[in-house]
Amino acid sequence: MILDEIIEKTKEDLILRKEKLNFEELEKKLKTINSKPKDVKTFLKSTKEEPIRIIAEVKKASPSKGIIKEDFNPLEIALEYSQNGANAISVLTEPHYFKGNLEYLSTIKNSVSTPLLRKDFIVDKYQIAEALLYGADFILLIAKALNEKELKELYEYARSLDLEVLVEIHDNEDLTKALNSNATIIGINHRNLGTFEMDMALCDKLIPLIPKDKIIVAESGVSDTEVIKRLHNVGADAFLIGEHFMRVPSIKDELTKFKNTLN
């Protein structure tokens, strides 16, 4: 299964990174940070004034699609998102399968005020400390990649650093884990990370089981206003969109159109 493969590679990378800078030294570096992460919840919760919230993703490649954008300039893409109403920006930092880079995060942080998500396969506190050091305001934790104890521990460590957490789920078992970790932002990924198959009815199945005080993010396969409208009506607050924005002629036009879905 590709998820297991990515996790294995991530753990190998972590061994090398820890040899260069151990966890204690990394945590010491966190004390030099002057600003606190933004309160992401206020940016992602749907309101009457701004019902559609968008997390726009900086994404060069994926295991299912290969290279998505050849002429890839992460900063230019992030600036376009920031200037055209994205509520948050997701920055892929996984290097092997998604061609991401941690440096993208710090480069973008220096140029935009929009909240930033470190999108990666996080399995260790080390990666969470890195996320804060490089400028993330929130991180992704994938329920499928962690057992309940691990998810809870990583969630609590992130919150101790004032980082918010997007906990990604794909089924009822994941949802139970997410709720037991006290997640406040729950992402429903329509794509099965084991098979890459899409289930666009997943929000319809899972949202009714989620307490109303949670913020719900719909992920994968969101590519037109009809899908956004339908998922918003089911209960999604925000939409994480990456590949679609990477392929359109004008990010500005597409983002503006999506933001105005209900107008």
From Swiss-Prot:
* Keywords from the UniProt entry: Amino-acid biosynthesis, Aromatic amino acid biosynthesis, Decarboxylase, Lyase, Tryptophan biosynthesis
- Which EC class is the enzyme in? lyase
Which residues form each disulfide bond in the chain? none
Q: Which family does it belong to?
A: Belongs to the TrpC family.
Reaction catalysed by this chain?
Answer: 1-(2-carboxyphenylamino)-1-deoxy-D-ribulose 5-phosphate + H(+) = (1S,2R)-1-C-(indol-3-yl)glycerol 3-phosphate + CO2 + H2O
Q: Does the keyword Cell membrane apply?
A: no
Q: In which pathway does it act?
A: Amino-acid biosynthesis; L-tryptophan biosynthesis; L-tryptophan from chorismate: step 4/5
What species does this protein belong to?
A: Aliarcobacter butzleri (strain RM4018)
EC number of the protein? 4.1.1.48
Question: Which Gene Ontology terms describe the biological processes this protein takes part in?
Answer: L-tryptophan biosynthetic process
Report the protein name in the record.
Answer: Indole-3-glycerol phosphate synthase
Q: Name one GO molecular function term.
A: indole-3-glycerol-phosphate synthase activity
